[in-house]
Amino acid sequence: MSKLDYGFNIPALKVMKLKEIQTPCLLSDYETFKINVEKMRSFTHENNIKLRPHAKMHKSVEVAKYQLQYGNASGICCQKLSEAEVFVSSGIKDILITNQITDL
């Protein structure tokens, strides 16, 4: 196990009680999520622009990969180098770190 493997791989199911869900956990209506990604893909395609979604809301490799594959995204943004490391280790290569990196 590398330092990037955190072990949070237990999916939350609709039948689970809130106290049974391992946290932190991203909960989303998958159909609405897909519709929103498609709307952004259509908008960016029609206006000849690229989207670079920020991963700070979801912090999810799976969501970022979906946005890249289906959402006309040119890459992703994240806040910190440690977040970028997780995305790079999962195969995402086009990442913009939106904060300054210092040696402090």
Regions found by a protein language model. Name each.
Residues 8-13, 32-65:
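N-terminal glycine-rich anion-binding loops that anchor highly charged ligand groups
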Residues 20-23, 44-46, 64-66, 92:
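A generic short-segment signal for beta-strand/edge and adjacent turn/coil regions
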Residues 1-7:
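N-terminal hydrophobic targeting/anchoring segments and the immediately downstream early-domain regions
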Residues 9-28:
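Generic N-terminal amphipathic, Lys/Arg-enriched alpha-helix
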Residues 54-104:
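Active-site-proximal beta-alpha core segment in soluble small-molecule metabolic enzymes
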Residues 2, 17, 70-72:
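Serine/threonine-rich low-complexity intrinsically disordered regions
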Residues 22-30, 50-54, 70-76:
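Active-site mouth loops of central-metabolism enzymes
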Residues 14-18, 43, 74:
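Bulky hydrophobic/aromatic packing residues
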